Design a protein with these regions (language model features):
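Accessory cap/linker subdomain of secreted extracellular hydrolases
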Residues: 51-55, 59-77, 81-88, 93, ...
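Conserved alpha/beta-hydrolase
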Residues: 88, 92-108
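Alpha/beta-hydrolase fold nucleophile elbow
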Residues: 135-148
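Short beta-strand/loop motif that positions the catalytic acidic residue
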Residues: 263, 269-271
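Conserved alpha/beta-hydrolase "acid-adjacent" motif
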Residues: 275-281
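A fold-wide structural signal in alpha/beta-hydrolase
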Residues: 24, 41-44, 92-99
Length: 282
């Protein structure tokens, strides 16, 4: 059930349901201005757990960030900070609604965990179009995020959601085969390690065996606590998937590498000299 609170100048909808085309319910947190109105939306959709505090999931990175860039702490309590997504305390005062969605099988959203899959991309499309129809939305949906939350922007943009207005892609690979899994045709172990270390610990169904949210004391990975066997049935084996699809022409990769010619919305893309090279060259 959605809980609504008024905190830090924002109206916040916690764990709001979004129904997918197959009937599955995803869960979203919505940060909006307190004043009733129709606002542009900044959306993220992904696997890292919308209730997982930056300081709990990535403490070394947090400590480095606040040491090197103390201005991050200015004008924000930082208690809504999550990994690689926008801080609503910086965007909502400027007249935006920030929507964070736990992807299928991750965090508070049930279902089968399969990152970057066509099903996940379709869900993202559905979320964009859902947000455009809400009473607090002006129908213009922007996407903004880093890494995972950037990669899946390329993917969903290929589907051309009618209400997708613009994207801010920060360090987001486009070609998951060449830029992520098989560097120069040689298998890279990063993807499997990332899935094991960053996705599975946020899988829905961990319940009391997972993280607790600082913001409310509830469980980051849902109220239910499933057995290890049940959790295994509810997720893909990404390392196996990538190793068994060795060629870029395999259907697995073709379903995950978007066609740039079908992406028509304005894009701001930035990255360091690595990873996202294809998107710059195109």
């Amino acid at each position: 059930m959605t809980k609504i609170t008024f905190n830090d100048g924002m109206k916040i909808y916690w764990d709001h349901p979004i129904e997918m085309d197959d009937g599955l319910i995803l869960r979203a947190d919505i940060f909006s201005p307190e004043k009733v109105g129709k606002y542009p939306v900044i959306m993220t959709y992904g696997v890292y757990g919308k209730w997982l505090d930056f300081r709990d999931g990535y403490k070394p990175q947090w400590d480095i960030m606040v040491d090197k860039f103390p201005e991050v702490m200015a004008n924000s309590s930082c208690k809504y900070q999550n990994w690689e997504v926008v801080d609503p305390e910086r965007w909502v005062p400027d007249g935006y609604v920030c929507v964070r969605i736990d992807s299928r099988g991750a965090g508070r959203s049930p279902g089968y965990l399969d990152p970057f899959s066509p099903r996940e991309t379709k869900d993202f499309y559905n979320c964009i179009e859902w947000a455009a129809q809400q009473e607090w939305s002006n129908g213009k949906i922007g996407l903004n995020g880093i890494s995972y939350y950037a990669i899946n922007q390329w993917q969903v943009a290929e589907l051309q959601p009618p209400n997708l207005a613009a994207m801010c892609i920060w360090e987001g690979a486009h070609d998951l085969y060449r830029e992520w899994a098989y560097h120069g045709g040689i298998y890279c172990t990063y993807g499997g390690n990332w899935y094991k270390g960053r996705c599975i610990p946020r899988q829905n169904g961990l319940g009391m065996n997972g993280y607790k949210a600082r913001i409310n004391g509830d469980y980051v990975s849902g109220p239910l606590t499933l057995s290890n066997e049940e959790l295994g049935y509810n997720r893909t084996n990404m390392n196996r998937d990538m190793l068994s699809n060795k060629l870029v022409t395999d259907q697995y990769w073709q379903e995950r590498i978007p066609d740039f010619s079908k992406i028509t919305v304005p894009v701001l893309s930035a990255a360091n000299w690595g990873g996202a090279i294809t998107s710059f060259s195109r």
